Amino acid sequence: MKKEIYNLEGIEIEVEKYDKSDKDAERRRLAYCFRMIREKSGMSRTGFSVWLGVPYRTMQEWELGRRAMPEYVLRLIAYKVVNELREGRIG
């Protein structure tokens, strides 16, 4: 499958390019990007959920692709991670 680069607030993530007819593709793409952002932060799921103030179960459901995550939420989280990494407060 072809790959494409997805840029979230300066974090570049390589994702598989999905068929447009696949109705679950967007949810899976966002879930994968969320996991990559968390890993970039250097935090565990538990630590990341506490740091964000998001219930662990909600974050877990987003990361596993079981619950749809709004793209604007993903962008806000990416923005926070990028800025905290830049300031040296995480990572």
Specify the residue positions occupied by each region the protein language model found.
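N-terminal flexible/basic segments that precede or flank functional cores
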Residues: M1-R28, L76-A78, N83-G91
